[in-house]
A protein has these predicted regions:
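Active-site segment of metal-dependent pyrophosphate-handling enzymes
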Residues: 1-31, 66-69, 90-101
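NUDIX/MutT-family hydrolases
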Residues: 1-8, 20-27, 33-60
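Intrinsic disorder/low-complexity segments enriched in polar/charged and small flexible residues
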Residues: 7-10, 47, 76, 118
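Short helix/loop capping segments that flank catalytic or ligand/cofactor-binding pockets
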Residues: 13, 32-34, 121-123
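Short, surface-exposed linear patches
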Residues: 26, 45-48, 66-68, 134-137
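Generic detection of long, well-ordered alpha-helical segments
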Residues: 59-67
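Core RNA-modification/binding signature centered on pseudouridine synthases
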Residues: 64, 71-73, 78-151
Length: 151
């Protein structure tokens, strides 16, 4: 079963823009993954703790949409007690588009602001129309993510 999981639109401040959708599904235990060496340059099957450790140490870089989607997947997996239960429970999840905005934090950091943040509409940019309310799975996620400023 394939479950539509999240929908992210690259913000205007990025030079390359995408309208990306993420899906969750089960794969056979002996499934082999491959990369195209263009958009994807590397792959690995890792446990949540290993990914978190690699991200914290700087050994692994991950785009904000991928990072947020993984955190949402992990949270749902824990909440539902396993993959099959998660996929069944989430098969009708509401998936609004998420178009982040950037807030300047200082000389060394930037903050990515998501549409359910109370200050989203005050930040100038081409943000998406906000909804009157967002699904609980999004509201459970932080509405801001900080990253070192790339030079």
């Amino acid at each position: 079963r394939l479950v539509y999981w999240s929908h992210w639109i690259t913000p205007a401040f990025e030079s390359r823009r995408f309208d990306t959708r993420f899906f969750a599904l089960t794969v056979p235990p002996d499934q082999e993954a491959s990369v195209d060496r263009g958009e994807l340059t590397h792959h690995a099957w890792l446990a949540e703790a290993d990914i978190c450790s690699h991200l914290a140490s700087g050994e692994m870089k991950m785009a904000p949409p991928t990072r947020a989607t993984l955190q949402d997947l992990w949270s749902s997996h824990r909440r539902h007690g396993g993959l099959a239960a998660m996929l069944e429970a989430e098969r009708t999840r509401i998936v609004p588009p998420i178009l982040p905005k950037r807030a300047e934090v200082g000389a060394t950091e930037v903050e990515i602001v998501l549409p359910w943040d109370e200050q989203y509409l005050q930040i100038p940019s081409d943000g998406c129309r906000t909804l009157a309310s967002y699904p609980d799975h999004l509201l459970a996620m932080p509405s801001r993510m900080r990253f070192p400023r790339l030079r």
